[in-house]
């Protein structure tokens, strides 16, 4: 079965991360060549993946 990625795991988008986490890319605007995104749990961000939307 598919499992979500825990905090600090490298990710491609919010859907890779577990609910409550979001895929954070701190270097997105500075160094695209070494882009490294990771699942984080910052309070001011939410996971926007459709699979976690509450019905």
Curated annotation (Swiss-Prot):
Residues 1-53 form the Oxytoxin-type inhibitor cystine knot (ICK) domain. It is found in: Secreted. One of its GO terms (molecular function) is toxin activity. Expressed by the venom gland. The modification Serine amide is found at residue 55. One of its GO terms (cellular component) is extracellular region. Disulfide bonds join 4-18, 11-23, 15-49, 17-39, 25-37. Its main location: secreted. InterPro entries: OXYTX_ICK. Keywords: Amidation, Calcium channel impairing toxin, Disulfide bond, Ion channel impairing toxin, Knottin, Neurotoxin, Secreted, Toxin, Voltage-gated calcium channel impairing toxin. Weak blocker of vertebrate P/Q-, N- and L-type voltage-gated calcium channels (Cav1 and Cav2). Is both paralytic and lethal when injected into lepidopteran larvae. Is not toxic to mice. The presence of a 'disulfide through disulfide knot' structurally defines this protein as a knottin. This is Omega-oxotoxin-Ol1b. It comes from Oxyopes lineatus (Lynx spider).
């Amino acid at each position: 079965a598919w499992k979500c990625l825990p905090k600090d795991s490298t990710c491609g988008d919010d859907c890779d991360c577990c609910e409550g986490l979001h895929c954070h890319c701190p270097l997105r605007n500075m160094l695209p060549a070494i882009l490294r995104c990771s699942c984080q749990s910052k309070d001011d961000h939410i996971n926007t993946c459709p699979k976690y939307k509450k019905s």
